[in-house]
Amino acid sequence: MNKRQRIGVSLIIGLMTLSVTAWAANNDPLTISADRLSYDGNSGRADAQGNVVITQQDKTMTGATGWYNTKTREAQLEGGVSMIGTDIAMSAETVHSINDNQFNATGAVHLQRQERQIFGDSVDYNTDTEYGKVTGNARLIAEGTTLTGNQVEGWLKEIRAVAQGDVTFTNSERNVSGSGDSATYTQTPNQNDGMVLLSGNAHAVQNGNVLNAPELKIRLADNSAETLGGRSTLVIVPNQ
């Protein structure tokens, strides 16, 4: 083994030792593997190229290239990124993480937490609070209801979402859909108490009947609707 090879092997061993040691202090060991690894001891940054795998606790992230900083606990992966955990999965083109719990994902993002899903061009998500902000082609699916908009903020732990811009919602089980400038959707997990508040040019269709108003409050449990904010119009379609 020549001098350059010995240095390369020592560098990789040093990288893995530093990574594990830094995380062992927090009882959360971390492992990085890749086709090529390099490490800057001054900055604490490890650069990885080719089949990158970062594993910590129950989460495994993979990508084509990436880096991790052992001092700042920051990481970034690019190129067909995926993250899989016990009850979470995410795919995107690029993922940047801070403190191992705050993620910014861009490029055809799909995140699933248990049975709840969010899609969009860009997603900011915190795994501790389960708060996510989706920008661009935003879509949230929870408890049978799909909510879309230019932007959607979601609190997945409590099932609460606020959508802005060209908003739509659908619930095929309840045979109801609607649209508006903005919407707020709330529901208690595993309870039949879902409610959608549409604001601004609110429009809803329930079992073929059409309702238009400045604001609409729709209760999914009994398919009831309440108009708010001004003059409203109801179009009733006779049973065929």
Model-found features: residue ranges?
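Mature-chain termini and adjacent capping regions
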Residues: 1-240
